[in-house]
Structures are given as C-alpha cells and as structure tokens.
A protein has these predicted regions:
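Short, flexible hinge/linker loops that cap or flank conserved catalytic cores
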Residues: 210-212
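Acidic catalytic cores of enzymes that act on phosphate-bearing nucleotides/polynucleotides
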Residues: 214-217
C-alpha cells in the first residue's frame, strides 16, 4: 500500500511532519533522501546506509538509462534489488541531467545572480547537447554521442521499468539567466508534461498491475521567480 499520513503541524500551518507509506517501508518526513545516482551510494554499503539511519535512496533515470540500461535493472527485480537495498527507493525523471549536461553547467549555481555572469554558470567551449521542444528533449549521450529523445512518456516508461517506489514527473530545467518570459513558457510546458506523465503513469500502472504500486510525484518549478 502507498499513502501519506500527517502526524503533526505547526500552529501557523506552514510546516508539518508525516509518514510516507510505501511497499518497501515507511519514510518519516521531513526526510533526507540519500543519493545513489547509478543505483550505488559511493563509499557506503547498503548495510552501512541502514546503520546510518538512511530511510530511502534515490537513483537517476537518465544515468541508469544510459548505463547499464533500465531493461537490465528491471530484469534484476528493480532498482532496490539491483543495489541490494530493501528500503524505499526514488527515481528522478532524468530532466535535470538531460538539460544540465546538455548546457554544460558549471557548479556555480545560486539564487542571487547579481554578481554572476552567464560565463560563471555555463561551461565554455561546449556545443549544446540538448534541445527542448514542446514534445520533449533531444540530446546526445555524453558517453558515445548517440542521439536520444526523452519525452514524458519515455521518462515514465523508464522509471516504471526501474521499479522505484516513488517516481518524478518529467520537467524542464531552466537557468537563472533565462528571461521571466521564458521561465513562464517553460513552467507551462512543465505543467503540460506533468499531465502527460500522469496519463502514461496510469496506463503503465494498469498494464503492470501485478507489480507493487509506484507513486508519481510532481516537480515544483519557476526558477527565481
């Protein structure tokens, strides 16, 4: 079963604690979700994660799509079994990685860009490897240059095959140097993509009804605005 239970609220209503119930265990919120990008948390074993109090692990749909492939992870029993982690798992949609790697972002990212220039954020001397349109994102693999295309439907298909308890809707990543007009355009595109993700998620959930239920979470966008 899957669900969310509120356990307490602040008097002003601006904060709460709760419990997310998943097929692989409960998550007390607010929670730090450990990042295991390629279905592996660097330098820590699953047992060590448990000893440290980790409640859940997040893997990356984009990276697992490229290597070793979501079909292989599916055949292994899903991302949890693939990484020998028996607790709750999350996957993100791949949108951030597709677009950030495509633009060649540096590590300099901040909400206050008054003292920054585009050169501080966008890596120099790199061709843009990702192009966005209303249908999705076309990009080249940084591994071998192969051309791929992610759409909301493709992201949902990959994440269903990865089998995490919680999946993320496919969204468009923008930079703090995009104009407000473009941010609004991208936000509306992300909203439409979320609707497409939900429709495909429902279709795949019915098609794979024998599998444990996977939840779909939305992504809040809007950049600095």
């Amino acid at each position: 079963t899957f669900g969310f239970q509120v356990t307490s609220r602040l008097d002003n209503g601006l904060g709460r604690t709760g419990i997310i119930h998943t097929p692989h265990g409960d998550i007390e919120t607010p929670a730090f979700i450990v990042v295991g990008t390629k279905a592996s948390v660097k330098a820590l074993t699953p047992d060590q994660l448990t000893d440290l109090g980790a409640q859940a692990v997040l893997a990356n749909a984009y990276h697992l799509f490229l290597q070793p492939g979501h079909d292989l992870v599916d055949e292994a029993g899903g991302v949890g079994q693939f990484m020998a982690w028996d607790g709750p798992t999350f996957t993100d949609s791949g949108g951030f990685q597709v677009l950030s790697l495509g633009a060649g972002f540096k590590k300099t990212l901040a909400m206050d860009v008054s003292q920054l220039t585009e050169a501080d954020v966008i890596a120099a001397d790199r061709d843009r490897k990702a192009m966005v349109d209303d249908g999705g994102v076309t990009f080249r693999s940084p591994l071998n240059g192969d051309l791929h295309r992610f759409t909301p439907e493709v992201s949902m298909s990959i994440q269903h095959r990865l089998g995490a308890d919680v999946m993320m809707a496919f969204d468009e990543l923008t930079t703090l140097f995009n104009t407000r007009a473009y941010q609004e355009e991208a936000l509306e595109r992300t909203r439409r993509w979320a609707e497409r993700c939900l429709a495909e998620h429902r279709r795949l959930s019915a098609e794979r009804a024998e599998r444990p239920y996977q939840a779909l979470y939305g992504v809040i966008q809007g950049a600095q605005y």
